[in-house]
Regions:
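Beta-strand-rich domains and repeat architectures in extracellular enzymes and scaffolds
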Residues: 1-27
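Beta-rich, blade/repeat-based domains predominating
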Residues: 1-11, 49-74, 111-132, 143, ...
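Conserved beta-strand positions in repeat-built beta-propeller and related beta-rich domains
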Residues: 16-22, 65, 73-77, 84, ...
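Beta-propeller blade signature
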Residues: 29-35, 87-99, 146-154
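Beta-propeller fold detector
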Residues: 35-46, 102-107, 156-174, 229-243, ...
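Short loop/turn segments immediately following beta-strands, especially the blade-tip
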Residues: 97, 151-156, 221-233
Length: 297
């Protein structure tokens, strides 16, 4: 099975996610214990229960340890990139002290669309009563977006829905391992990669959210205060977006305490570093870096 998410808790525990993309996935979330994969929090939770879809992991794309004793689990509920199973998409908080699910955040139909693919998540506890979560919708069939979740009451809403900055660049044709990358359909025909908003990172002070479509080399940012402000319509919100330049084509991103952004460059088997002053450089290049995705620091 192919891992897409990796995260390390404040106590050094390592967790990995395996979305169901066609491989034989025995469990979609695991903890690495003694160099072995162990279903987390247990095997039962990793078995799809159609009678209780909110209490099980269906196809997890991202896991994020918050450094405060919680593992956040983002369940696409969309195995094989299918339409999300009705009522299955969710954000789950797991207590790392008890290894029990503490809270489940589900989404209404106007937030998780039939085309939605929940990709990655960032958490900020400094705003609101209990904090906010920011999630990328990396749909390749519908509008991309950033989904905002109020962690106090579970309310969620889509922002920059279908905006050009959350949408795949139609002029972008990636080259990976020296070859043009295209979709190949079951009938043998090829089509362009159209994956929308994917990579996401938040600044150390929580005031800036960085994001990028997967089918693009561009990096964007937006102030999180205006992103959360529902009184600002998307038609106006887009004017607050800042274009930060070409960083290379990325899947995942992360920021550190010094305000530096680290982003994968899957076309060049590299990791890029973007300094607060906007300077960009490559810090690692290796043929072993095949499609660098999730980062954890």
């Amino acid at each position: 099975a192919m891992p897409t998410g990796v995260t390390i808790s404040e106590k050094g525990r390592i967790f990995v996610s395996f979305p169901k993309w066609g491989d034989d996935v025995k469990f979609t979330v695991a903890e690495i214990v003694d160099n072995k994969l162990v279903p987390y929090p247990d095997l039962k939770t990793n078995k799809v229960d159609y009678d209780n879809l909110l209490r099980c992991f269906i196809s997890v794309q991202s896991v994020v340890a918050d450094g405060c004793g919680t593992l956040w689990v983002l369940d696409t509920a969309a195995p094989n990139f299918s339409q999300p199973i009705d009522g299955g998409s969710k954000l789950i908080a797991v207590d790392l002290n008890t290894n029990k699910i503490r809270r489940i955040y589900s989404f209404p139909d106007n937030v998780v669309l039939p085309t939605t693919y929940l990709n990655d998540v960032r958490i900020d506890y400094r705003v609101g009563k209990e904090g906010y979560a920011y999630i990328t919708d990396s749909s390749d069939k519908g509008p991309g977006a950033i989904i905002v979740v109020d962690l106090s009451d579970g309310r969620s809403f889509r922002r920059l829905n279908g905006d050009s900055t959350t949408t795949a660049n139609t002029d972008f044709i990636p080259k990976v391992e020296g070859k043009v990358l295209l979709n190949r359909d079951t009938d043998g025909k090829t089509s362009q990669i159209t994956i929308a908003a994917d990579g996401i990172a938040i600044s150390e002070d929580g005031k800036t959210l960085y994001y990028c479509p997967l089918a693009s080399r561009d990096l964007y940012s937006i102030n999180t205060d205006v992103l959360r402000d529902e009184s600002i319509p998307d038609s106006v919100l887009c004017s607050y977006v800042k274009y930060l330049g070409e960083k290379g084509a990325s899947d995942g991103m992360i920021t550190d305490s010094k305000g530096i952004i680290y982003a994968g460059d899957y076309e060049n088997n590299s990791i890029r570093r973007i300094s607060p002053d906007g300077e960009m450089d490559t810090i690692v290049h290796s043929p072993h870096l095949l499609w660098p995705d999730t980062f954890t620091i």
